[in-house]
Amino acid sequence: MVLPTVAIVGRPNVGKSTLFNRIAGERISIVEDVEGVTRDRIYTTGEWLNRKFSLIDTGGIDDVDAPFMEQIKHQADIAMTEADVIVFVVSGKEGVTDADEYVSLILYKTNKPVILAVNKVDNPEMRNDIYDFYSLGLGDPYPLSSVHGIGTGDILDAIVENLPVEEENENPDIIRFSLIGRPNVGKSSLINAILGEDRVIASPVAGTTRDAIDTNFVDSQGQEYTMIDTAGMRKSGKVYENTEKYSVMRSMRAIDRSDVVLMVINAEEGIREYDKRIAGFAHEAGKGIIIVVNKWDTIEKDSHTVSQWEADIRDNFQFLSYAPIIFVSAETKQRLHKLPDMIKRISESQNKRIPSAVLNDVIMDAIAINPTPTDKGKRLKIFYATQVAVKPPTFVVFVNEEELMHFSYLRFLENQIREAFVFEGTPINLIARKRK
């Protein structure tokens, strides 16, 4: 199911990231009391009253070198293009500013719900000052102190009230996959080559894909697929120079919708920090993952090239040890015929269910190979395990004391389960829980 998107917009230093962290329930953006410091995680999942939504802190997408008004205009552009609900954060301490009026004019022209959050209302006396914000023409202002958590519930109530109606679940028989990666790694060319037709504009200039495009196709065995392209960021025909920053958000939305993610790397340029960041999002989301090295035809090779590349990938993506690697060329179509079958196998692994009796046989065999650890004379006891979810496969291991389950032993059990049941290309989760 596609999660609705909520974008937090506002000029620097009004508390966007603090509100983001409050809603997310954790400190995942870098927050300092200096303008423009949000440079870390900008995307997470929020939940309120049993409604889940994707949350974007647009401050994390600002170009620090861009002029001030251009930065906030970019934020508004992002919100208008991508968000279902916009939270416009202003400062109650500073009152209405020219920048606030500028953004409000842009947001007013959208047909999207805008929630006006007046932050830094840290004491009751300041509540009278929020009425000045009615002049922005965006409806009732909500007093908020995101530092103290006061008023956050009212903001969340308003968000949920304005979220679009939940869509019915998509056809579970269709495998949905996306191609993610830096601009100009060849995602569009890969799509064209897989489909055998020019469905997407492919150009050597980074960021030229005009919008995200879903394409459906059927393989020779009758399996249906939906392919999601994520390249580019469009607003009135203009592609921003900071394409990588904007493509992060587009990739996040595609990852949400995908069963399997193809992490595309440009063989000509090698692995970059951006690649690891995006791959980390896919891993944390529990998606099936294939590492696709594109433009393989363009580099010189010897008998050691493949093994050197594989070692480099494993070193840089240690958290993706389960992900298969394939070297392809969109230009020559080298190995592209293997991708649909790989995607299908990984989707099957994502949905695989293991009977409890069989699972516990593997757990007991694992304990026989490597006995459970002890801590201060007390030994970990494993009573039984059961699978509780798929996509990704998730198992609960019931024990005498959760604290005795060291991370290393949990990883050992995970590897034993993965090997026994051939979980290809998917993370699997093991959770230790005390038996009651």
Swiss-Prot record:
Family matches, as InterPro entries: G_ENGA (IPR031166), GTP-bd (IPR006073), GTPase_Der (IPR016484), KH_dom-like (IPR032859), KH_dom-like_a/b (IPR015946), P-loop_NTPase (IPR027417), Small_GTP-bd (IPR005225)
Pfam families with a match to the protein in the record: KH_dom-like, MMR_HSR1
GO biological process: ribosome biogenesis
Organism superkingdom: Bacteria
Binding site for GTP 1: 10-17, 57-61, 119-122
GO-annotated molecular function: GTP binding; ribosome binding
Binding site for GTP 2: 181-188, 229-233, 294-297
Protein keywords: GTP-binding, Nucleotide-binding, Repeat, Ribosome biogenesis
Ranges where the KH-like domain occurs: 352-436
Record domain EngA-type G: where: 4-167, 175-351
Key word Repeat present: yes
Family label: Belongs to the TRAFAC class TrmE-Era-EngA-EngB-Septin-like GTPase superfamily. EngA (Der) GTPase family.
Protein task: GTPase that plays an essential role in the late steps of ribosome biogenesis.
Self-association and partners: Associates with the 50S ribosomal subunit.
Name of the featured protein: GTPase Der
Lineage summary: Bacteria, Bacillati, Bacillota, Bacilli, Lactobacillales
Gene (UniProt): der
